[in-house]
Design a protein with these regions (language model features):
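Transmembrane helix exit motif
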Residues: 88-110, 204-215
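Transmembrane-helix boundary and interhelical-loop signature of multi-pass inner-membrane proteins
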Residues: 41-42, 62-84, 170-214
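Juxtamembrane helix-boundary/capping and inter-helix hinge elements in multi-pass membrane proteins
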Residues: 35-46, 79, 114-117, 144-152, ...
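Structural signature of hydrophobic alpha-helical transmembrane segments
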Residues: 12-29, 78-88, 157-171
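Membrane helix-loop-helix hairpins that form the core translocation module of multi-pass transporters
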Residues: 46-100
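Small-residue-enriched transmembrane helix starts and helix-helix packing motifs
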Residues: 1-22, 99, 106-126
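Juxtamembrane transmembrane-helix termini in multi-pass membrane transport proteins
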Residues: 12-64
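Low-complexity, proline/glycine-enriched hydrophobic segments characteristic of transmembrane helices
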Residues: 1, 214-238
C-alpha cells in the first residue's frame, strides 16, 4: 500500500515537472532575463531572481489549486486566457526583437528601490516572460480534476507543490547565473541568442493565440465537439 502511494506521488511530481519545465524553459529565457535586468547591480539581479522564483511558485501553485475555479467564477475559458496571454507574449517578444539588447549604463548608477525591484520582478519578468499563458494553462489543466478521495487529494496536492518547487528551483538557478552563461557566449553570441530567443518567444505567442482561437472556432462551428484532456495518473486505493 505504501509503495503504491509512493509510486502515485512520484508519478504526479514527474507529470508536473515534465509538463511545466519544457514550456517555461528558463535556460532559453536566461539571456532575455539578463538583458531586461542589465541596469541592475549583480546583487540586485540575484535578489530579483529570487523574487521571480517566488512569484513563479505562487502563480503556478495558485493556477493548479484554484485556477479552474477562478476562471469558472468569472466565466472565462482557457482559450480566452490563451488568446489574451498570447497577445501579451507577442508584444513583449516584439519589443525584445527590435529593442536594444543591453544599454551601456553602469550598474552603480541605477540602484533600484525594493518596490521597484518587486514590480519589475512580477511584470514583466515573472509574467509573462517566465510564467506565461501557456504554462498557466498547463497548470490549470494539471489541477482541473482533483481526486475526491481525501488521502489521494492530499497526496496529489503535496506532489504538485514538490513539482512546482523543482521547476522554480530550475528557474532560479538559470536566472541567478545567467551572467555566467552570457559571459561564455560573448557579446555577439549573447546578441544572437537573445534575438533568436525573442523570435522563438514571438512564435510561441502566436501559436498560443492560434491554439486559443482555434478552440473557440471549433466551439462555434462544432458545438457538440468536446475537448479531450490527457488522462491523469490513477489515484491509489485506500
Amino acid at each position: 500500500m505504501l509503495l503504491e502511494h509512493i509510486h502515485y506521488f512520484a508519478g504526479i511530481v514527474f507529470i508536473a515537472v515534465a509538463a511545466l519545465l519544457p514550456i517555461i524553459d528558463p535556460f532559453a529565457g536566461a539571456p532575455i532575463y539578463l538583458a531586461m535586468t542589465s541596469g541592475l547591480s549583480p546583487e540586485e539581479r540575484a535578489r530579483t531572481a529570487k523574487l521571480v522564483a517566488l512569484n513563479s511558485f505562487l502563480l503556478l501553485l495558485a493556477s493548479i489549486l484554484i485556477g479552474a475555479y477562478v476562471l469558472d467564477f468569472f466565466g472565462v475559458s482557457i482559450p480566452a486566457v490563451q488568446v489574451a496571454g498570447g497577445i501579451v507574449v507577442c508584444v513583449l517578444a516584439w519589443s525584445l526583437l527590435n529593442g536594444p539588447i543591453a544599454p551601456d549604463v553602469p550598474a552603480s548608477t541605477t540602484l533600484a528601490s525594493a518596490d521597484s525591484l518587486k514590480q519589475r520582478a512580477f511584470y514583466p519578468l515573472t509574467m509573462p516572460l517566465t510564467v506565461g499563458p501557456g504554462s498557466i494553462s498547463v497548470a490549470i489543466t494539471l489541477g482541473a480534476n482533483p481526486p475526491r478521495n481525501l488521502r489521494a487529494l492530499l497526496t496529489t496536492t503535496l506532489a504538485h507543490v514538490v513539482g512546482v518547487l523543482i521547476t522554480v528551483v530550475a528557474i532560479y538557478l538559470c536566472y541567478r547565473y545567467a551572467d555566467r552563461l552570457v559571459r561564455r557566449l560573448g557579446k555577439t553570441g549573447t546578441n544572437i541568442m537573445i534575438r533568436l530567443t525573442a523570435f522563438i518567444l514571438l512564435a510561441i505567442g502566436t501559436q498560443i493565440i492560434w491554439n486559443g482561437a482555434r478552440t473557440m472556432l471549433v466551439g462555434v462551428l462544432h458545438p457538440g465537439v468536446a475537448a479531450t484532456a490527457p488522462a491523469a495518473a490513477a489515484a491509489p486505493r485506500d
